[in-house]
Amino acid sequence: KLFVTKKNIDKGIIFWNQNKKTLLRAEKKFGVPSEIIIAIIGIESKYGSRTGTFKTFDTLASLSLGANKGRRAKFYKDELINFLLMCRENKLDPRKIKGSYAGALGKPQFISSSYRHYAIDFNGDNVVDLWNSNEDVIGSVANYFKKNGWKKNQLIMSNLIYENSNKKYVENESKKTYKPKTSYETFMNNELYTD
């Protein structure tokens, strides 16, 4: 409901129509379908309409070194270092870059380390620009997926079919977490199936 609204769908169609050639080129080069690339850009920044208003240096410095730094201070310190390196490598003024309240940058909302590892010049102008170049944004999102193991035509989702006696495995996996708690083999050994 939050992301799939008529307004967002309409913006996505406009973005898709305006960038068809680039999306097809990225799909051909990286194997990532256009609709996946479109969805990421739409969710992350509403196709570039919300890239952030916070000074990224100030944000990362506060989150890593400030009085209110939290449990993720080391993560943000590493991102601050990556941000400064990214600015030097791309000849950007760190005082002028703006992003999200968490330091995410540009239309794809890459954190600084992701920018350095996955952002690419996809329009051939020798500049990586994730704010103003839809070509670079599209190529970078596709590159991110490819470098993180995306396989063309590989299944990305399926239904899980289980009997009530095995409900505990599904309930355990459904609790909020960043990493799976139950292996595929455990599911299969307990008569849980995918369609």
Name every feature range the model reports, one short phrase each:
Residues N90-D195:
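Flexible, glycine-rich surface segments
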Residues L2-G139:
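Acidic/His-rich structured neighborhood in mature extracellular/periplasmic domains
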